Amino acid sequence: MRPVFFSLRFFPPCWLCALRDLCAKFFFVATQSRMFEGARPSESVDSAPPRVTLRNFFNHPFDSAIAAARTCYADHLITPEEVTDKQRLNIGAATFNSGHHTVFQHATFEFGLENVSRQFVWSFLHAHPFYNSEQQSQRYVRMDRVQAYVPPVDLYFNESAKEIFEQAISRAWSYYRELSALLINDTRAILADIWRIGPNSNPKHIQKIERSAEKRAIEIARYVLPVAAHTTMVHTISGIVLHRLWRMVAASDAPSETRTVIGAMVAQVKEHDQQFFERFGTEPLEELPEWKAASSIAFAGEAFAREFDAKLGGKTSKLVDYSPNAARVIADSYRAVLGLTESQCSNSDAIDRLLNPAKNLYRLETLNVGVHAPQMRALQHANYTFAKKISHTADSQDQRHRMVPGSRPLLTLADTREPDYITPQLLKENPRAQEVYERAMRDAWSAKNALLDRGVPPEIALYLLPNSKSIRLVETGSLLHLLHKWTMRTCFNAQEEIYAASMDEVGELRRVHPELAKYVGPPCHIRAGITTPICTEGSHFCGIKVWLDFPNVTRRI
């Protein structure tokens, strides 16, 4: 039986709620049965331990490092096969211990990581810029199975505490399924209206909208899932980064899990080349300044949150510092690259040559060649700093813009007893879904607090926090890298919160540097009237001609 769709173009606004209820009447039973498939009243948690696989690697990483070091002072290219035992002993220790670490960066290791928590990934693995990851998406992959990190039982996390922990995780998954079912009618109705779906629409078009509606529903429902939820990824790092990660395993909100995962990565490398670690004796730092400082002060999570939010003034992202002479410095830098005088190229002309996509083909590149283009490097000299507040799940994606680094909180030092979370717009527009969502938030914080009250370490208790947990951070980037980020994240396909933050940031840029901001917008805005295709998303086109009225066009989903 083919689903029936209605076009909202033919209904006055006051009928929308009635139409949503009508949609629910037709679709809820089928949707619920599909989305709740496999659900049980009290599901057990699949808590398989982290699994690390070394997928690709250098055969002789240590000898390659020594050969690279020798090449600096040799009359020919030194190969790993030419390295002697004496050189391994003398050159290896001399370069490593004196801080000449670039030679250990040539060797790279590609790992497969399974059954690791999203808390570990956010708090540690992706908290620095020197890596590459392809991670399983919660936005578009339905989380059917209850899979999450569960710490081993010990003196501070006994069986009764573990029961509270696992029940909270199982309950979160139930809320996830319930919200998925409650929201799909809303997402379907909005998408049907955007794409003008009617009874006579092409069945394949209708099927595509149905798939998209389900993805949009689970994208919002995932906000209730715990940060303990498992994820899977391919993760590639250099040899020196692996050394640094092992040294800093205590520097996160999940030190125990971190030690387990990074320790397994080190062990995998040692199996292929024991010298790469054994020669230097790198060991984890046990006492970090962050924890030492925290031990002498009282926790003030609520007070910190109130103070930070007051400074934001209701914004998602607020400009707190910037290069006041950005336009002139950029223009001077552009002229320096091309050897021009100010009489030959004025400030406004330099800015236009750099940022106008009709005059600078680099702006139309999807390969992001900015750092390789001599003239685009002029944008490196203007910097902007933002204070922002987004959810854990949004920040997990936002932090992937590694050239726009942020100072993110140690949640164990900024914990709040009261629920502190972000609510997506779609939930605010559905009273029933919002009620379920708020109950899920209360339950998550109650379980977390119950563990803390039992003496369970914050490291463990905070795994129960939901994806929606508010993250307050400070982020800085040069205009070069912010330009790339804003181009990608002002697209309607960008994650809702990151889109909102980016729009706030572009608005702030417009306030202080309007001569720069007029060139900023999503790919379609940049490309319209200059090249084709206007939209670079292909079959994932959002359905809205954003380029006709950016930044005034309204995003509905």
Predicted regions, residues:
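Short, low-complexity, charge-dense intrinsically disordered segments
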Residues: M1-V4, L8-R9, P13-C23, Q32
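A conserved ligand/cofactor-binding region detector
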Residues: V29-I557
